[in-house]
Amino acid sequence: MKPNILFITIDALRADKTYGKNKTSTTPHIDSLISKGVYFEQTIAAADQTGSSLASIFTSNFPITFGINQFNFSSKTETMLNIFKKSGYYIDGFVPDHDFFKSLTENFDNSDVYQAEKKASWKRLGDGLGAQIIDRITTNKMKKPWFLYIHVMDIRPPFEVPNEFRDEK
């Protein structure tokens, strides 16, 4: 029997703050997931932007390989999600509505795309997104085996420059 896979990415999370002997943040739930699953102790970002970095994670290629910059990602590009789908996995996800994720979710069996146009409206885990995710997993709404991808934006908004200030020098 194939295992179910829960794949979580957290926008703007620094690994050095949340794991290892020198960590400076308290993360009991992440620690619990790590103890029960797989954690990669050495990670190096392929790019300094979310879209480019995630494209590298999902394709195992550097962004320069196929000209990805920011959220410019073709749904025709082979990803690990396509491979899991071909292997019989039900693909589901909770992602923001950036262009990158729109392309990525075109091949999903189901997805909840939450609004990102107005940064204040990004769903946070504590504002209902977490409950939706738990409900999806515990009520067997996904066919087995499943691959559930979650991209969390909870720690991102404090670092986001408001639109009205983006063009200022």
State the predicted function of each range.
Residues 1-169:
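Catalytic domains that recognize anionic headgroups
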